[in-house]
Amino acid sequence: MTDEDDKQNYRVEHDSMGEVRVPADAKWRAQTQRAVENFPISGQRLERAHIEALARIKGAAAKVNAELGVLDKDVAEAIQEAAAEVAEGRWDEHFPVDVFQTGSGTSSNMNANEVIATLATERLGRDVHPNDHVNASQSSNDVFPSSIHIAATAAVTRDLVPALEHLAAALGRKSEEFADVVKAGRTHLMDATPVTLGQEFGGYAAQVRYGVERLAASLPRLAELPLGGTAVGTGINTPPGFSAAVIAEVARVTGLPLTEARDHFEAQGARDGIVETSGQLRTIAVGLTKIANDLRWMASGPRTGLSEISLPDLQPGSSIMPGKVNPVIPEAVLMVAAQVTGNDATVAAAGAAGNFELNVMLPVIAKNVLESVRLLAHVSRLLADRTVDGIVAHRDRAREYAESSPSVVTPLNKYIGYEEAAKVAKKALAERQTIRQVVLESGYVDRGDLTLEQLDEALDVLRMTHP
């Protein structure tokens, strides 16, 4: 490559450490380029929602800085316009910094500062500085964690909660549809007293609804922002009123229930609020694991499994066994749940990395929480639309299991006692007879321990599903 070619492909930028060659068409500048060269680790960049949150902060800060006399009006307006474009996703390709970078997220904060400064400079026709103007009254140490909380709050409230409510509604509809489908209950994967399929689906719907409740309970801590605390939580280099004003502006622009941190030192030195949210995401994942596994068990077969329900056939299940169809959506749910559980372990470890006034694993917290929210939101809708809505109950098969379970002997305890009832159950299993047959053959009715009517009432499997 000739010097002339080099000049066409690159330009020279400067920062406090000296000169840096930057791709000629890049909107970023020196500090971003240093980060690109320092962290060629995963190839994973910030989530789109995270870039948007950073840009919303920059736009709001410019507006408030102008109102408080920190920035000239024309500079602030140019920054606001540039930040709006970044928030809309028009410049995502100019955010190349790897997620695995400096633990404060300074590289990504400077990436935002530099891109917005370049765009604002092009608009204004004179220099807009990434630090002096775009980052005015701010520090990476309050901006970056605030951006994580903004992005996560938006993702939880706008994506995940509606998706979970959608799934809960689908499960609730099936609960009503299957209200009279009696089946064998199972504990320890062994036969137990009867339940209805509707009761089971009602339980699944409740699990999902309670997940929404847990998210709602943690939301106030997630929506607290350390913005305005700057370097260490003291608010150094901010004008009076900046913190409250900039958070109010971000809340207005985003429509999110954002509030100023009650204690800026907690809000920058610790990440407990988002660790709590990650724990709620893990709990939801655990619940979805239980639901997905139950669906797989009940649909197992078609000949040698339980076959109490059918799931929709979505795709061929085997490259060698013709006609085989597998429960692909529940399996995808299980993998998402495993990923979310692993993400939470990462977030917990990263959350413990707060030393004195700053947590230094912020980018990896952001990556894992936002990924967990996205995965759970997508897979919840898929589970509802492509599996739950199409489930069909095999009523006769389910009732047959319920009636053949030795545990239906349980209501006879009050007539013949626990020990005699246990003998009946064991004999029924050994001789492959029904409980009713063994009771009659053993003479309990003839001896007057109970009447035939009482026996029939006690062995009504649907009646057993209620107190």
Swiss-Prot record:
Pathway assignment: Carbohydrate metabolism; tricarboxylic acid cycle; (S)-malate from fumarate: step 1/1
Record GO terms (molecular function): fumarate hydratase activity
Record keywords: Cytoplasm, Lyase, Tricarboxylic acid cycle
PROSITE patterns for this protein: FUMARATE_LYASES
UniProt-listed GO biological process terms: fumarate metabolic process; tricarboxylic acid cycle
Cellular-component GO terms for this entry: cytoplasm
Main location: cytoplasm
Pfam family, one: FumaraseC_C
Listed EC numbers: 4.2.1.2
Compartment(s) where it occurs, according to its Swiss-Prot or TrEMBL record: Cytoplasm
Annotated site residue numbers, Important for catalytic activity: 331
Coiled coil regions in record: none
Catalytic activity: (S)-malate = fumarate + H2O
Enzyme class: lyase
Transmembrane annotation, as ranges: none
SUPFAM superfamilies: L-aspartase-like (SSF48557)
Keyword Transmembrane helix: no
InterPro entries, A to Z: Fum_hydII (IPR005677), Fumarase/histidase_N (IPR024083), Fumarase_C_C (IPR018951), Fumarate_lyase_CS (IPR020557), Fumarate_lyase_fam (IPR000362), Fumarate_lyase_N (IPR022761), L-Aspartase-like (IPR008948)
Domain of life per record: Bacteria
Binding site for substrate: 104-106, 126, 129-132, 139-141, 187, 319, 324-326
Miscellaneous notes: There are 2 substrate-binding sites: the catalytic A site, and the non-catalytic B site that may play a role in the transfer of substrate or product between the active site and the solvent. Alternatively, the B site may bind allosteric effectors.
Description of how the protein assembles with itself and partners: Homotetramer.
PANTHER family assigned to the protein according to its UniProt record, in alphabetical order: ASPARTATEAMMONIA/ARGININOSUCCINATE/ADENYLOSUCCINATE LYASE, FUMARATE HYDRATASE CLASS II
Protein name according to UniProt: Fumarate hydratase class II
Protein source organism: Streptomyces avermitilis (strain ATCC 31267 / DSM 46492 / JCM 5070 / NBRC 14893 / NCIMB 12804 / NRRL 8165 / MA-4680)
Gene (name only): fumC
